[in-house]
């Protein structure tokens, strides 16, 4: 799809990229420059894939755009595809990921504490959030590592799988949740 050019296009772009779905198999993938507030690429897509995002970014580079940074929803492998470009994982999407694992009303004390901690993300710096996440882990490590044994097979699995998944998601994504702090000169957003 072609975008009508109303304003001069920027030479440098801070890319916010996301796909919005209308129904199950029709989506619109948009790459927008957060500086000029212009959509630089708009495509109809059936599915959201890393290959489509890579192709859209390559097309922008071929048009002469210098991609200064990327803010995205954190699809698996997407942030690692562009090691030369500072990439920020959308903090709002990270909160949604934790919500998917814990629900909005966790039942356990550990889950409630992690849910409250997750809500401090937007107001925290990396060092403070990392320290609070580590303190949460140290307080709840035993609970997090509890295992349940299947009496028939003798095999075991983690009892609190969704809590572990929520914690590990935050821990794994920590470096990408605060990229904007490491590059203040770029004026990066922390959310899509």
List each model region and its residues.
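RNase H-like nuclease fold core
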Residues: 1-76, 80-85, 173
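Intrinsic structural disorder
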Residues: 1-2, 33, 62, 93, ...
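Short conserved micro-motifs on helix faces and helix-strand junctions that flank
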Residues: 15, 90, 190-192
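Residue-level signal for alpha-helical context at structural boundaries
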Residues: 38, 55, 78, 88, ...
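Intrinsic-disorder/low-complexity, polar/charged segments
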Residues: 49-53, 90, 122-129
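Acidic/histidine-rich catalytic cores and adjacent linkers
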Residues: 65, 72-76, 116-192
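Conserved beta-strand -> loop -> alpha-helix junction used to position metal-binding or nucleic-acid-contacting
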Residues: 69-118
